[in-house]
Amino acid sequence: TFVGPPPRALSLHSATLPAEVSAGDLLRARVVLEPAIAREAATRRDEADIRELHLLVDGGRRAQRFAECEQADSAFHNAIARMTRSPAIAGTMAWLSSARRHAAWQRDWERSYRGLAPATFQTSHSDQHQRIVEVIAAGDGDAAFDAMQLHLEDIAAAFLPARACNQPGGINR
């Protein structure tokens, strides 16, 4: 039996923690978790899942504004998590995505990534999303892991200043 509240640093209260998560923390979590999620999705996908992912990639290519890019990206990554057929995985991904709606994420994004979207999202990121769909559709879990990792590392490199990647909370392991 535990007496008292858990240490603040370990709190997972869904209403407060996303607001406390920095862009570096969020990207690090995504780089660690999402490749494994993509691998699992490749083993559990069905034709309806693949059709949904193709539609989401097409929607991303048509995104014209920042908000549309963010919505398309979030929908794509959350769809992959749902493909695992695990409510725990899908819920974790939805929770991570919710951090992107908070002020800290928006400020970090504004400082470092704004110049790239939506043009980069329509091209490079959508091409990466398409590659992820192809390998998931093929049922190649290892290739799905690699494609997702490459995609997220590319985002992190564009999103975070190089100095932030090498500091605590940055994405480098």
Per-region residue spans from a language model:
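Charged, glycine/proline-rich intrinsically disordered loops and linkers
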Residues: D108-T120
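Conserved amphipathic alpha-helical segments that form helical-bundle/coiled-coil interaction surfaces
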Residues: L26-E110, Q128-R131, D146-I155, A162
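C-terminal-biased regions
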Residues: P118-E134, G141-R173
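Short linear motifs at protein or domain termini
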Residues: T1-R39, T43, A164-R173
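Residue-level recognition of short, well-ordered coil/turn positions
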Residues: R65, D140-G141
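Hydrophobic aliphatic residue packing
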Residues: T1-V3, H13, I80, I132-I136, ...
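Residues at secondary-structure transition points
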Residues: L17-G24, R28, A67, Q71, ...
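Short coil/turn segments at secondary-structure junctions
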Residues: L17-V21, G60, Q64, L116, ...
